[in-house]
Amino acid sequence: MAEAQTALWGLVEEFVVGEQDSKSAEVAAGVKDGVFTVLQVVESLGSCLANPEPRMRSKGVQLLSRVLLECYSRLTEKEVEVLVVFYENRLKDHHLITPHVLQGLMALSMCDVLPQGVAVSVLKSVFQEVHVQSLMQIDRHTVYMIITNFMKTREEELKNLGADFTYGFIQVMDGEKDPRNLLVAFYIVQDIVTKNYALGPFVEELFEVTSCYFPIDFTPPPSDPHGITREHLIMGLRAVLASTSRFAEFLLPLLIEKMDSEMQSAKLDSLQTLSACCTVYGQKELKEFLSGLWSSIRREVFQTASEKIEAEGLAALQALSACLSRSVLSPDAEDLLDSFLNNILQDCKHHLCEPDMKLVWPSAKLLQAAAGGSSRACWKVTANVLPLLLEQYNQHAQSSHRRTILEMTLGFLKLQSRWLDEEDENGLGNLKESLCSMVFSAVTDSSTQLHVVALKILTVLAMQQGFMASSDIDLVVDHLTRLILQKTDSESCMAAVEASGTLAKVHPSAFISRMLPQLCANLQTEPMDINLNESGVVPEHSIRQLCLEALAAVSTHQSILKETVPILLDYIRRAHNGEEETNVENVVSVCKSLHRVAVQCQLDSESLQFYHQTVLPCLLSLTVQAATQDSGTSSHILLRDDILTAMVPVISAACTHLKPELASKSTSQIVSLFLDGDISLLSENNFSSKFQPFQVNGPTELQNRLVSLLMAFICSLPRNVEIPHLRRLLQHLLSLSLSGCSLFAYSSASKCFAGLINKCPQGDLLDDILKVTAQRIDVGLVEEPSRTQAITLLVWVTKALVLRYHPLSGQLTDKMIGLLSDQQLGPSVANMFSLLVSDSPDILNKACHADIRIMFRQRFFTENVPKLVQGFNSANGDDKPNYLKALSHVLNTLPKQVLMPELPSLLSLLLEALSCPDKVVQLSTLICLEPLLQEAPETLKVHIDGLISKLLGLSCSPAMAVRITALKCILALTKLPLHMLLPYKQQVIRALAKPLDDKKRLVRKEAVETRCQWFLLGSPGS
């Protein structure tokens, strides 16, 4: 025991006299290990704490406080009691000691065994003995943390202090300037208010001590290590100011004053704070200030040039309206909402009669914001405004005026429809006839600019159940049909298609009886070739295409779906049978419509089941029939690359959201069809020969192409769906991938194989297949006839494994990098690096449930870019472009923040890529460089001369895309420091004269903007 005490004295002496700060950690470790107690530490400090020198006493208290910060959780209640008395006495000591006393008190404030009354005693001592704002920032922060800790654990005790606690804290905070401390102080004030601490007579003082920081004017220093932003302080202060209605009488005049100031940030902050306050205030708090608030908001919306301030002003007005709507009125009380809305109507309503004047839209926005506060506000405003707008529509004959009136009407009707659920009946009943008359008039007007807005209004009205009679709904559908089938205005047509898709969910029977027959008739009678208008120019959308888009758009209800899907499939069937002159583009359009229908069905299991069980067998039947019959008896149009490619997303979208039972059943049937020729799934089975899609060469060559449809189905299934006969299926796909069949067939087989490999569970099957695949690829790369097939399979398998982080992906990627030096395959392999790192539309994507690990691109970059750079450096001159192209493809898909750290090491290589004659390399490199140029001035400093020279040269490239992107890069350079650019200013301006006369408008546009920015370099205000 004596030995431990001696050791403790030694450590204390070394810390206090020897100035060895590390000894405090040794003392703390001794306390933790039970070698000595905290009270023994206090005893050993006796002579030190009684020393007449303040510096010596300070060192003693510092040692004790450091020990307590390490060991506070081990203290007993008795020890805490003794230490608190000790520290409270030390607060009366010399000011040098105060910071260390506060550190000790902070340690004690974190103890779980605080005796009753200690928190109150400590805070009273701090409030009385410490002049907080004379302390250093870190010591003031310690005081805030002591208060915070006690508020968390001793709330009821502190509340017993009454308003003295609030007054004490006001003294602590008064004059605080450091943003780190202010954040904590704001949180404390918010807790004081929201947890109902007594404010007593100090409400105004508490408000003043916080509101003096409003509005926040703080800009964090560059590279601020604390990460405190102006936004953090704004939100902290706003939470305080909006925490209680007791601040209202002081805050609202302040907000009005700041809204009327010239500072944009003050206006914005005031409006946002007002919106926050309205969630807490009631009519009583707002009553006196409503007139001033309305005047300020009105002025900002009427006069401001800032869209942000206008938006916040409108939001604040809506919040005021909502606040006034919430208050419960006594029978004899004034309805402030009513009088407030009357003022707004009085100031704004008359401007709606001037649709060509400047204030019409600000007035409409203000009225709509006020109406958006509640259903009561909405009915009040719309009841006053809509009759006026209806009257104005009839009084103005000019189309532009009428469009403005319609757009305002649309805004009010959208607001009104939001509150329908809260009302027993539609408040527009007395305006129904006038509204319908106006909208039907607009939708039949000769001016097409009215149609789009009128259709939106019709949609809002027709979506309100019971508002329009069935005869009116029929008329709406007739108008939609007419606009879809008209040949004059594509904008109206597309708006009608969009409106039809929305309304068909609510009124399916009207669309089935009135629109579908006309669409179907036009689909069948329109000539197969693309329609020409009277001037012989091809319109943007042929009638046939619009009919197809409309059929897809309205297929949002199961009853409509059962009508439209057979119509679309029948068109494909007629194309297959050669019943009329066939146009491939139209079949592709039908497939696009079927795909849209499938996507719309995905969230409704019943609709999806119908779609899946109808579309999948039909498409497979028709294509299998086409592939198994002679060209003399059947058209092969459905086996065209572009049509099969268009069918892939149709089948894929029908499979991604299937229920497990249906998915398993369909999988079994389709695998049996492709492996064994089992045609029981197919709706039509009059086939002249057996279906053998995996047989290579011979009469089954057309059948090989249908593997693309197998891919669409089987690679889109969720990963938990078991694939029967998977080993056998993979073996067949592997053989077909390396066979001498058509490019479309072996590419589809490779993609299907890769899609299955990506989802295949880890185990013997995957290991065996990958081993055989690697061997077959090696053999294929050696044999001349199959090299292209082998490299296609290699890239897809590599991608499948890269996505799932499979160990073999590295070996396969190395093989691809090695092939960049291959004289025959090098250029195509370089292009395939784009496929490795970019998203695939048909397989190996998230929609198809592929196994995709996060940040796979970053990992691929880290592992392989050094190898590409090394390969480039060692390659001969003819092969270098292949490495540059592969590198630019990889870099192009990475986020800027990943590329920036690597830019210094890669920049010289990227500049060399700009000199590569390959246009793909040039464009890819430029796209990669553009976002990086303004971010790395120090890196670019060395290369700026060569960079500008190369970019100016590329601005005259034969390829338009290269010219445009080069000009964008030259524009991006203007963000660099001025001293780097001024030496090149005249050279760039002269060189950009040529792109100004470019034959392409988009190039000229980019050149004008770029040259203007270079002209402005160095000018005042630039």
Curated annotation (Swiss-Prot):
Has UniProt tagged this entry with the keyword Secreted? no
Q: Which cysteines are joined by disulfide bonds?
A: none
Q: Which residues form a coiled coil?
A: none
- Give the UniProt entry's GO cellular component terms: cytoplasm; cytosolic [4Fe-4S] assembly targeting complex; MMXD complex; nucleus
Q: Which SUPFAM superfamilies match?
A: ARM repeat
Q: Which domain of life is it from?
A: Eukaryota
Transmembrane helix found in the keyword field: no
Localization annotation? Nucleus; Cytoplasm, Cytoskeleton, Spindle
What Gene Ontology biological process does one annotation of this record name? DNA repair
Q: Where are the HEAT repeats?
A: 858-896, 900-938, 941-979, 982-1020
Q: Give UniProt keywords alphabetically.
A: Cytoplasm, Cytoskeleton, DNA damage, DNA repair, Nucleus, Repeat
Q: How the protein assembles, per its UniProt entry?
A: Component of the CIA complex.
Cited function: Key component of the cytosolic iron-sulfur protein assembly (CIA) complex, a multiprotein complex that mediates the incorporation of iron-sulfur cluster into apoproteins specifically involved in DNA metabolism and genomic integrity. In the CIA complex, MMS19 acts as an adapter between early-acting CIA components and a subset of cellular target iron-sulfur proteins.
PANTHER family recorded = DNA REPAIR/TRANSCRIPTION PROTEIN MET18/MMS19 (PTHR12891), MMS19 NUCLEOTIDE EXCISION REPAIR PROTEIN HOMOLOG (PTHR12891:SF0)
The UniProt similarity line reads: Belongs to the MET18/MMS19 family.
- In Swiss-Prot or TrEMBL terms, this protein is called MMS19 nucleotide excision repair protein homolog
The protein's organism comes out as Xenopus laevis
Gene that produces this protein? mms19
